[in-house]
Amino acid sequence: MPNTSSESLPRDLAEDVVKEVNRDQVKIAAVQISGYDKGDERREGYDAADELIPYIGRAGEDEAQLVVFPEYILGHIKVPSSSTEKIATAAAKHSIYVIVGCWEVYNDDTFANTALFFDRDGKIMGKYYKTHAAVDHYEGTPAWSRPPSDKSREWFLKNDPEWIMNRGNDLPVFEFDFGRVGILTCYDGWFPEPFQVLSLKGAELIVWINGRGGSVEDFIMKTAMFQSHVAMVTANQAYGSGTMIGDPSKWPTRILARCPDKSEAYISATIDLRRIRKIRSTSRNFQERRPELYGKAVEPMSNNGPCNS
């Protein structure tokens, strides 16, 4: 599974906009919008990328450095494709980073739940593959140990695609020109360890993209910001809610902007990376860690569950 794409746009596409990089005060935008969902097939004549382009332009005019879109939203696509080329063109035009989710389809018809990172020149600078599968159906003991055995590939694609997706095996941190960024996708954020690992790898900002009904949990976001000293951005599809931007430098943490309703919305806010870096460099939490006590957290769980091993 490739990690990066060499596809990029001609430099002159980005010549109209040249942004001065401020590594201390960084404006971030997030968009709550619906496109393709978890089990959706491609619809002829519909490209969800077309829905995103105006928001990339709005974020650029808003002088944001990064704009974040939800999980799944581009649907099942090859990378690169006409959809990614549209995003790349808009990113280059407005000299802005873009993070957006899709089902990335490979030549052998396998696929992954992928977050694409576009840099200011429109190049796909990296990818993140969802690591924890949010499956809905199972059989066997213990629970969730294996998928239903009597279902076809077509059934899984429509009803429970994460059973058969290629799962990621890494929690990478990406170097942006304003700072270090990690990413998680939906169910990944229900585990405390990924937030901690990304922070310990140097992430100053964690992006958490979602595609689900209900609201993204602000208590998870606040806990992660407080314990791991990272800023956070969440983005959800518009049939849900809870798109947020948060800053841990406001004691104990603060949600700077949010979308509380199930509707299409755009938010932006400025995070204080200078202060976050200072907090990270002087954190008692980091200095007083006792990793020799935490081994149980990374041991596989026995078939009898965590309390009976």
Residue ranges and their predicted role:
Residues 80-99, 180, 185-273:
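CN hydrolase (nitrilase-like) catalytic-core segments centered on the catalytic cysteine
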